[in-house]
Swiss-Prot record:
It is a peripheral membrane protein. Belongs to the ATPase alpha/beta chains family. The gene is atpA. It is an enzyme of class 7 (translocase). The keyword rRNA-binding does not apply. It is found in: Plastid, Chloroplast thylakoid membrane. Pfam families: ATP-synt_ab (PF00006), ATP-synt_ab_C (PF00306), ATP-synt_ab_N (PF02874). Transmembrane segments: none annotated. InterPro entries: ATP_synth_asu-like_sf (IPR023366), ATP_synth_asu_C (IPR000793), ATP_synth_asu_C_sf (IPR038376), ATP_synth_F1_a_nt-bd_dom (IPR033732), ATP_synth_F1_asu (IPR005294), ATPase_a/bsu_AS (IPR020003), ATPase_F1/V1/A1_a/bsu_N (IPR004100), ATPase_F1/V1/A1_a/bsu_N_sf (IPR036121). Keywords: ATP synthesis, ATP-binding, CF(1), Chloroplast, Hydrogen ion transport, Ion transport, Membrane, Nucleotide-binding, Plastid, Thylakoid, Translocase, Transport. Produces ATP from ADP in the presence of a proton gradient across the membrane. The alpha chain is a regulatory subunit. This is ATP synthase subunit alpha, chloroplastic.
Length: 505
């Protein structure tokens, strides 16, 4: 029989008592009154903050959006099927935040920063709030550097600068996402971090974007934030803010960033759904009264910081989908008034084979021209005016039977300029080659080229300049303007290519 030694037992008990630390945890706990459609009403959380994260019994997280006298309206960031009436809800004392860091580059994450690409979860040491205040006036500087999209029509007539907000607006299937992806692909070797926020899209569309970027070698400097169509409205609502927070991390490190929100129409619809379920009073088109603030607080986070803060920038390209070209609807007019210009894509132009289908007449850039390189200003100054005059003349010529020679020449040149600006998908053009293309069109070198052969001639000219006249590219890169030596080389290149091209026809 084992001997019991009371003195040893009492010593052990005394030791345990001495080491025992009392830890009292206080947490505010409420009760679910009602749940359904991704919304829960909770009673008893009297000290909860607006936007605070709440934890339900099944570990589902929600955001407190409505703070009322007798209950709190919570939007759920997960499935509500396991949440029952009467179940407890804990307040966490935290506001929504995500991990941020270089580890996210090349990854696909959800609106909460969790990996959804099947790879290892990124491990980051830093967190950042999803909702951050936009930089103030003093810490900003005016837009002074260009952000080249690689699309000739945009870089010449609707230029975008680093730190600008440029809206891409148009009907469905007019090439809005293609412009955004071309811009990402064109940032290769430009030291620009790109973030693509896919809001309310099909998972297959997001997979296609990922494969395109991977194929073009652009995924390494890109982060994709996806809140797919089958995810709760709350995740579609916060996805753009998550993308902005990831971009801000790099911006405050002195880097240039580009954020694409594809698209904000779906975010507004998700917010409308949440607001109506929370019984907020509906306004125009049933959107809540603060839908303008929804987009303004997001887009104001785009900025070009001053040199004291490292000179980083966040350029925003929000996308808005219109119905039958109606830019005067509620959400389009809101976002047009917030941004620094818009690129309007027309379904009529798209269907008539003009791609990218940019309507130059109503597309503008309010600040980007200040950041355009001098060489582009020199050659593209007249381009927008010539195209506008051509569009007017073309409409008039449909009713006129006989036109004088000058009008016929103007129409012929306009058709060639329009042909010159056509560009295939996922093939951005470097700015030096764009200058050569526009110079040849504006100065009448394309007038003798048959209309259907213009694209072949431009391809031949680009190849000739890259392979045989690389000094032209070096001169533009170093001087940023079309010096007389570069112009002479360009004229010679165009004439030599033209002679060879016309001889082979």
């Amino acid at each position: 029989m084992v001997n019991i030694r009371p003195d040893e037992i009492s010593t052990i008990i005394k030791e345990q008592i001495e080491k025992y630390e009392t830890e009292v945890r206080f947490s505010a706990v409420g009760t679910v009154l009602q749940v359904g459609h991704g919304i829960a009403r909770v009673y008893g959380l009297e000290e909860v903050m607006a936007g605070e994260l709440l934890e339900f019994e099944d570990k589902t997280i929600g955001i407190a959006l409505n703070l009322e006298n007798d209950n709190v309206g919570v939007v759920l960031m997960g499935d509500d099927s396991n949440i029952l009436e009467g179940s407890p809800v804990k307040s966490t004392g935290k506001i929504a935040e995500i991990p941020v860091g270089e580890e996210f580059l090349g990854r696909v994450v959800n609106a909460l920063g969790k990996s959804i690409d099947g790879k290892v979860e990124p491990v980051c040491s830093e967190n950042r709030l999803i909702e951050m205040l936009a930089p103030g006036i003093i810490v900003r500087q005016s837009v002074c550097e260009p952000l080249q999209t690689g699309i000739t029509a945009i870089d010449s007539m609707i230029p975008i600068g680093r730190g600008q907000r440029e809206l891409i607006i148009g009907d469905r299937q007019t090439g809005k996402t293609s412009i955004a992806l071309d811009t990402i692909i064109n940032q290769k070797d430009q030291d620009v971090i790109c973030i693509y926020a896919a809001i309310g899209q099909k998972a297959s569309s997001v997979a296609q974007v990922v494969s395109t970027l991977e194929e073009k070698g652009a995924l390494g400097y890109t982060i994709i934030v996806a809140a797919n169509a089958d995810e709760p409205a709350s995740l579609q609502y916060i996805a753009p803010y998550t993308a902005a927070s990831l971009a801000e991390y790099f911006m405050y490190k002195g880097k240039a960033t580009l954020v694409i929100y594809d698209d904000l129409t779906k975010q507004a619809q998700a917010y409308r759904q949440m607001s109506l379920l929370l019984r907020r009073p509906p306004g125009r088109e049933a959107y809540p009264g603060d839908v303008f603030y929804l987009h303004s607080r997001l887009l104001e986070r785009a900025a070009k910081l001053n040199q004291k803060l490292g000179g980083g920038s966040m350029t925003a390209l929000p996308i808005i989908e219109t119905q039958a070209g109606d830019v005067s609807a509620y959400i389009p007019t809101n976002v047009i008034s917030i941004t620094d210009g818009q690129i309007f894509l027309s379904s009529d132009l798209f269907n008539s084979g003009i791609r990218p289908a940019i309507n130059v007449g109503i597309s503008v850039s309010r600040v980007g021209s200040a950041a355009q390189i001098k060489a582009m200003k020199q050659v593209a100054g007249k381009l927008k005016l010539e195209l506008a005059q051509f569009a007017e003349l073309e409409a008039f010529s449909q009713f006129a039977s006989d036109l004088d020679k000058a009008t016929q020449n103007q129409l012929a040149r306009g058709q060639r300029l329009r042909e010159m600006l056509k560009q295939s998908q996922n093939s951005p053009i470097p700015v030096e080659e764009q200058i050569a293309i526009i110079y040849s069109g504006i100065n009448g070198y394309l007038d003798e080229i048959p209309l259907q052969k213009v694209s072949s001639f431009i391809k031949a000219l680009r190849e000739y300049i890259v392979n045989s006249k690389s000094k032209f590219i070096e001169l533009i890169k170093s001087n940023k303007q079309l010096v007389s030596e570069a112009e002479e080389i360009l004229k010679q290149s165009i004439q030599e290519t033209k002679a060879t091209f016309l001889a082979s026809e």
